[in-house]
Amino acid sequence: MTTDAVQTMIPTLDITERPAPAPRAKVEAGVKLRGAEKVARIPVKIIPTTELPKKPDWIRVRIPVSPEVDRIKALLRKHKLHSVCEEASCPNLGECFSGGTATFMIMGDICTRRCPFCDVGHGRPKPLDVNEPESLAIAIADLKLKYVVITSVDRDDLRDGGAQHFADCIREIRKLSPNVMLETLVPDYRGRMDVALEITAAEPPDVFNHNLETVPRLYKAARPGSDYQWSLTLLQKFKQMMPHIPTKSGLMLGLGETDEEVIEVMKRMREHDIDMLTLGQYLQPSRSHLPVQRFVHPDTFAWFAEEGYKMGFKNVASGPLVRSSYHADEQAKLVKASLVS
């Protein structure tokens, strides 16, 4: 599809490979690095953007101010929980919180990776909070939620990548809220896939989600420390172990990919038995993050959705403000019903 007429192009920022940085003292556990500090030691050099691009008319986000937003934030603080909605500066925070839903981020708010598209802080995480599974379960019961998404920071410091902590959270949640549907948005479990999947299969979610994030050509710049094929294999292996559970993945558009590359990744997803797809616009969190290379028009997102359904995806959520957990409850119900029938 020719998209010149439906995209606002942004000049490419110089992202160049650089030599490995000199060793330095370890960051103290619990110290969160963000922005320029976070991306200072990744394999590519990111030159800070002098001026953030003007967003087109189709990207307008209301300020998340309402009693329900305040109530959920207060509850999260009470139980010492984190939401990815806040940590990753999600544009749908107001809509989701106002609707009484949230995506919970477990295992702390400090990530062991330095992905330069992401607004979550980097550093040396503190030890896992053994009370978090119970606290999360109580919060979900208090909110009377029917559908919950659980995600996490990357925890490369843990032998199982945090898989057992996910399982513990699922078990505790189902004790207090047996009818709730649970979606997990997991890290890639780098170097520990098999043990992580064995743990996951013993306490499975209702939807298993892991995002590819971008096309393989851009992995070195956007996902340092991650591997495109590894992520595809993780999703496929889970599906082989638990064929009745939907698998899900997503891409951010606007990092410099072409439409043809997006279509190719979608084809690869289907070859790896992925059931559900999300496509959304990348929005640069700060001047120190990867720059937006284009704003994809809603018509192009609609075209991707059409192509996705032709390929056999059971659900495609594709739009400028779509994120992994956006209207996830509605999508999951449709897909679960189709897998059962």
From Swiss-Prot:
Gene Ontology terms: cellular component: cytoplasm
Record: residues binding [4Fe-4S] cluster 1: C85, C90, C96, S325
Cofactor: [4Fe-4S] cluster
The record's free-text note on cofactor binding: Binds 2 [4Fe-4S] clusters per subunit. One cluster is coordinated with 3 cysteines and an exchangeable S-adenosyl-L-methionine.
Radical SAM core domain location: 97-314
Reactions performed catalytically: [[Fe-S] cluster scaffold protein carrying a second [4Fe-4S](2+) cluster] + N(6)-octanoyl-L-lysyl-[protein] + 2 oxidized [2Fe-2S]-[ferredoxin] + 2 S-adenosyl-L-methionine + 4 H(+) = [[Fe-S] cluster scaffold protein] + N(6)-[(R)-dihydrolipoyl]-L-lysyl-[protein] + 4 Fe(3+) + 2 hydrogen sulfide + 2 5'-deoxyadenosine + 2 L-methionine + 2 reduced [2Fe-2S]-[ferredoxin]
Chief location category: cytoplasm
Annotated SMART domains: Elp3
Annotated pathway: Protein modification; protein lipoylation via endogenous pathway; protein N(6)-(lipoyl)lysine from octanoyl-[acyl-carrier-protein]: step 2/2
GO molecular function: 4 iron, 4 sulfur cluster binding; lipoate synthase activity; metal ion binding
Annotated [4Fe-4S] cluster 2 binding sites: C111, C115, C118
Keywords, sorted A to Z: 4Fe-4S, Cytoplasm, Iron, Iron-sulfur, Metal-binding, S-adenosyl-L-methionine, Transferase
PANTHER family reported in the protein's UniProt record: LIPOYL SYNTHASE (PTHR10949), LIPOYL SYNTHASE, MITOCHONDRIAL (PTHR10949:SF0)
Protein name listed in UniProt: Lipoyl synthase
Protein's organism: Pseudomonas fluorescens (strain SBW25)
Gene: lipA
